[in-house]
């Protein structure tokens, strides 16, 4: 009985064990079947746990993020959430997968931040260096010296000769840039420091004269004949008033220029004559009232004026041709030739300040120095630093004709015609001789020249 009951118990336990095992197997098989049905749409692929950096595009379905999230979920729970969940992919993901190959979206051209910085940096030097091509370092130094001397940008624009022709506005803008723009000021200072000392000395010698300097120079009398020692003594007595690059020679040249334009203290400017007589064209232009001028045109009046102008020009031409004939008669009546000539003077070279007498058949013109003595020192007339030490020679031929030969570097103008170096030109009575802004009138002693021609005519037949 006991054995039978024990056998029945064992058989029931075995049956229940097999039944429970079969139920577990069926449940596991059902779970596998359900998971395989759920994962039927997602293809199985091999993936690595190593993360590879690569460029991502907008039209690409990024799967690395999914792999990252799945590996993180595996590490946390040990079960992959994508494979355990029986849910299908969402409709938005399906749309992304279906639309991605058909219409690829181009990558947005977003500029890198470094590129924009590079563009901004390259634009700045263009604005800074836009004027560096025209304004040379020598121009900047000239501008600074001139402003420090005069404190007036208008005077600087009128008096300083730059390498380019700048307008007053450009000069003002450059001065303000040198003062207030740190970049331009730094670049200009660096360029000026690189100038050669000789170039700096030449630029400093061109500095404008201040009002204090001209006031001291105007005290030197116009009737006196100051030498270089006079101006050197003036420099020693007033070192603070004069610019540091001033020399006695520069002071003498500027004093002669002031004397020529009647700017000295003991010189008086001639007043305008009373009445309708006017000295020059500029004074006549000042007297004209512009408000009374009208722009009304009259064709009949213009025709009459044109005919009258043509008639007057013809009369002027005739008078010019007869001028030398009438000049002899006028001189003999008025006696104008007596104060200029004597029995030994062949001709006179008359300027504004000095009168040079020609008493030999050949005289030399130029600028006198200690080592070079010449007959006619043109520095007595005015500024002569542009005149050569031996500028020219005036000769009297046997036939009574005067000729001038140019031996200097600069041309000599005779009645407006240039006579270059190595050339010569015939001088007639009342010829205007211009040498480096100095003008002279050449007057011939007609009586003495007539005697010379008569003697030459007597000698030639023999």
From Swiss-Prot:
Domain notes: The N-terminal region is required for nuclear localization while the C-terminal region encompassing the FHA domain is required for centrosomal localization.
Organism of origin: Homo sapiens (Human)
Gene Ontology cellular component annotations, sorted alphabetically: cytoplasm; dendrite; histone acetyltransferase complex; Ino80 complex; MLL1 complex; NSL complex; nuclear body; nucleolus
SMART domains per record: FHA
Modified residue annotations for Phosphoserine: 22, 102, 108, 282
Positions of post-translational N-acetylmethionine modification: 1
Motif (UBR5-degron): 389-396
Gene Ontology MF term list: G-quadruplex RNA binding; poly(G) binding; poly(U) RNA binding; telomerase inhibitor activity
Subcellular compartments: Nucleus; Nucleus, Nucleolus; Cytoplasm; Cytoplasm, Cytoskeleton, Microtubule organizing center, Centrosome
Annotated ranges, domain FHA: 363-419
Keyword Transcription regulation assigned: yes
Phosphothreonine PTM sites in chain numbering: 103
Motif Nuclear localization signal: positions: 113-123
Role description: Modulates the transcription repressor activity of DAXX by recruiting it to the nucleolus. As part of the NSL complex, may be involved in acetylation of nucleosomal histone H4 on several lysine residues. Putative regulatory component of the chromatin remodeling INO80 complex which is involved in transcriptional regulation, DNA replication and probably DNA repair. May also be an inhibitor of TERT telomerase activity. Binds to G-quadruplex structures in mRNA. Binds to RNA homomer poly(G) and poly(U).
Pfam families per UniProt: FHA (PF00498), MCRS_N (PF13325)
Protein name: Microspherule protein 1
InterPro entries (UniProt xref): FHA_dom (IPR000253), MCRS1 (IPR037912), MCRS_N (IPR025999), SMAD_FHA_dom_sf (IPR008984)
Highest taxon, organism lineage: Eukaryota
PROSITE patterns documented for this protein: FHA_DOMAIN (PS50006)
Xref: Gene3D superfamilies: 2.60.200.20
